[in-house]
A protein has these predicted regions:
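Mature extracytoplasmic or organellar-lumen-exposed domains after removal of signal/transit peptides
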Residues: 1-222
């Protein structure tokens, strides 16, 4: 979803041959997934959305992003520069993309899924009749990993978007080992959960919380 939102926002950049005029209603509907024009048709009416996942469903933070989307639409198209910007220099695409990477993806990863691991059940399969042989804890761990990357063999693959992409950038991987350390912690924790060792998994939760904070801070400083 965020990939298509970003593509739509960038269509208003002045560097394009024919910069588009953004429609605020379209951006807002993409955010809450009432939108039906997705290029990826699997996103249509799939019951998932970015808005409800933003900052643990904080209405104030959601309103902030919606305000940026309205402002981006009002400012479009940008015919004076390469990027869609406010008079103060704020680049709307970056504010929305990077903001949601933090308020949605990083938040869901750490403050939602990993934060609940200690109380998750790890003894009963979720729904064997439906082919869901994993436990609640295994499922939530995998959900957290999915907010980092969708590639099981990261960082061999899965370095093309969002946190999986930025963690593997030289300024993060070479300096603080973000891609390697986060990948290792996720794998180590998942193995511990499958082995029934919750205490060992919680050690990896602590490592991941620290590593994600460092990754976000390092990206912001860069």
């Amino acid at each position: 979803m965020l990939s298509e939102i970003v593509t739509y926002l960038k269509s208003a950049n002045g560097s394009n041959p024919n910069p588009a005029t953004l429609d605020a209603a379209t951006l807002l509907s993409m955010y809450d997934n009432s939108y039906t024009g997705w290029s990826d048709t699997n996103l249509i009416d799939n019951g998932k959305q970015l808005k409800s996942k933003t900052a643990l469903n904080d209405a104030g933070i959601q309103a902030m992003f919606e305000g940026w989307m309205n402002d981006a639409a009002t400012a479009s198209p940008d015919l004076t520069g390469s990027y869609l910007q406010a008079a103060t220099g704020i680049e709307w695409t970056q504010m929305i993309e990077k903001g949601l990477m933090g308020a949605c993806f990083a938040s869901q990863m750490t403050s939602n899924y990993l934060a609940g691991i200690s109380t998750d059940d790890n003894t009963v399969a979720v729904d064997p009749a439906a082919g869901k042989y994993y436990t609640e804890m295994e499922h939530h761990w995998d959900e957290a990993y999915g907010y980092f990357t969708d590639a099981p063999d990261y960082p061999t693959n899965g370095t093309n978007r969002f946190w999986g992409k930025y963690a593997n950038k030289s300024y993060l991987e070479d300096n603080i080992g973000s891609a390697t350390d986060i990948s290792l912690a996720f794998r180590t924790g998942r193995a511990a959960i499958s082995a029934g060792d919750t205490d060992a998994a919680l050690v990896q939760v602590g490592i991941l919380e620290t590593e994600v904070k460092q990754m976000v801070a390092g990206m912001a400083l860069h």
